[in-house]
From Swiss-Prot:
Family assignment from sequence similarity: Belongs to the bacterial ribosomal protein bS6 family.
Name of the protein: Small ribosomal subunit protein bS6
Annotated segments matching region Disordered: 96-157
Coiled coil: none
NCBIfam families from the UniProt entry: S6
């Protein structure tokens, strides 16, 4: 049977429980038509690149599906009807990716960075070379403006 990756975005004001129920409903449709959900990943609430239907964030869910094309057609029809689904995309793939998806690996990498204490206070900025400023302090006033040589002066009539 053909393999598909299916991602749908649910409205941000839908609770996590509602998104799980929606995912369960979609999984039921897939299995009812002879398909199989190989993997399901909930990526959580993420910011959208641009506003969609007045939403700036959405719940992202990935489903790896093994089933006939009729399954995909019915899932997309159900999502078109459902008001909680903002967008969906189904792509046919040659084989499913083993292990966590790229989005989950990125989330793990970000979590590891937070645990290491990345960001935060990086020390004093005093000292170091600051060009013409002694000790890296305040530059002081600029001084008076010098006259312009390249433009003719405006004449009053």
């Amino acid at each position: 049977m053909p393999l598909y990756e299916h991602v749908f975005l649910a409205r941000q004001d839908a609770s996590t429980q509602q998104v799980e129920e929606l995912t369960t409903q979609i999984t039921g449709v897939i299995e009812g038509l002879g398909g199989k959900v190989v993997k399901m990943e909930a990526w959580g609430v993420r910011s959208l690149t641009y506003r969609m239907n007045k939403n700036r964030k959405a719940h992202f869910v990935l489903l790896n599906i093994d089933g006939p094309s009729a399954v995909v057609a019915e899932v997309e029809r159900q999502e078109r009807i459902n008001e909680d689904v903002i967008r969906y995309l189904t792509v046919r793939v040659d084989e499913h990716e083993e292990g966590p998806s790229a989005m989950m690996r990125k989330a793990d990498r970000d979590r590891d960075r937070d645990e290491r204490g990345g960001g935060g206070f990086r020390g004093d900025r005093e000292g170091g070379f600051r060009g013409d400023r002694e000790g890296g302090g305040f530059r002081g006033d600029r001084g008076p403006r010098r006259p312009r040589d390249d433009a003719p002066a405006a004449t009053e009539e």
